[in-house]
Design a protein with these regions (language model features):
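Rossmann-like NAD(P)(H) cofactor-binding subdomain of soluble oxidoreductases
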Residues: 1-58, 62
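Internal alpha-helical scaffold of NAD(P)-dependent oxidoreductase catalytic cores
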Residues: 29-39, 55-93, 103-142
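Short alpha-helical interface patches
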Residues: 3, 9, 84-95, 113, ...
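A short, flexible low-complexity segment enriched in Lys/Arg and Gly/Pro that occurs
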Residues: 18-24, 70-79, 163
């Protein structure tokens, strides 16, 4: 709320760094609401940070000096990667890097359950899925094959008849 922002600003020391996690309040608007305070950053943390594999884009305000930037980025290192991005793209990164896993986690868990139902131990199911997922991502993004060629590498695709409907759901959800 505006009053909470004003109250928070009153407590800020001049040498403080404020890192906003607010999704829609850009650095310029935040600086205005904070009475011109410019030692600002805005970031998009994501859930995979809990295993130090986060991809947490950050926008650094123009008023944030180099030493404060370095200290903030060092503080965030244990979370995973923290690429500096333009403030205008934070929401886009939120959709891809923060919400992206939610498109897949339930499917990964369903595959794990199937693997166990077919006889794999929980540990073997987990290890198999982990290796398969890493390999699948690397095949799609590092093989230099087109996405169509990658998807054609496996002759049997159990969800082939549902792919168009799934893509339609993704299109509807992103609007």
């Amino acid at each position: 709320t505006p009053s909470a922002i004003r109250d928070g600003f009153a407590a800020l020391r001049p040498d403080a760094v404020l890192c906003s996690l607010a999704p829609r309040l850009g650095l310029t608007a935040l600086q205005e609401k904070l009475g011109g305070f410019g030692r600002l950053a805005r970031m998009n943390p994501n859930a995979t940070s809990v295993v130090a594999q986060g991809y947490n884009p950050i926008a650094l305000g123009d008023g944030l000096p180099a030493d404060a930037r370095a200290a903030l980025l060092a503080l965030l290192t244990p979370l995973g990667q923290t690429p500096e991005v333009p403030d205008a793209l934070i929401e886009t990164y939120a959709v891809v890097s923060a919400m992206g896993p939610t498109y897949f986690w339930f499917q990964f868990d369903a595959l794990r359950q199937q693997a166990e139902a077919f006889g794999l131990s929980p540990a073997d199911a987990r290890d198999t899925l982990r290796a398969m997922l890493h390999g699948a991502v690397d095949t799609l993004f590092a093989s230099e094959l087109s996405p169509a060629r990658v998807m054609d590498l496996v002759p049997v695709r159990p969800l082939a008849d549902s792919e168009a409907a799934i893509l339609h759901l993704l299109d509807d959800d992103s609007e």
